[in-house]
A protein has these predicted regions:
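Negatively charged, low-complexity tracts enriched in Asp/Glu with abundant Ser/Thr
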Residues: 1-32
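Weak global preference for isoleucine
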Residues: 2, 20, 35-37, 54, ...
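Extended low-polarity, hydrophobic cluster-rich segments
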Residues: 18-26, 33-37, 81-89
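Amphipathic alpha-helical interaction modules
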Residues: 26-59
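Mixed-charge, Lys/Arg-enriched low-complexity segments
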Residues: 48-102
């Protein structure tokens, strides 16, 4: 499981979201990265879940969608969603060369 060290708000540049709540995580390279699992959305779009990896020195970042989930999938996942989101975070982090400590 990924450990949250701190939470921070980031403005998002694509205009679809006002801000994202990001969790500050530590990786094995000794650098800090903000990882967002659930953005705060302006419009109600419950069928989308996103994961963003942000270098700690950034003040804003363009939101990157890495997966699409339907409302039915969210309902079926229930409490398992946070564990599922952790997997998405790890995959996203690995795709940009960031190794996260478990």
């Amino acid at each position: 499981m990924i450990t949250t060290l701190e939470k921070k708000f980031f403005p998002v540049l694509n205009g679809e979201y006002t801000r994202i709540t990001a969790e500050l995580l530590y990786n094995s390279n000794g650098k800090y990265y903000y990882i967002s699992i659930n953005p705060e959305k302006v419009e109600r779009r419950a069928n989308y879940s996103t994961v963003t990896v942000i270098p700690a020195e950034c003040n804003s970042y363009k939101l990157q969608t890495v997966t699409r989930r339907t409302k039915k999938q969210d309902r079926l996942a229930g409490e398992d969603f946070s564990a599922l989101a952790s997997v998405f975070v790890k995959k996203k982090a690995e795709s940009i060369g960031v190794e996260l400590e478990a």
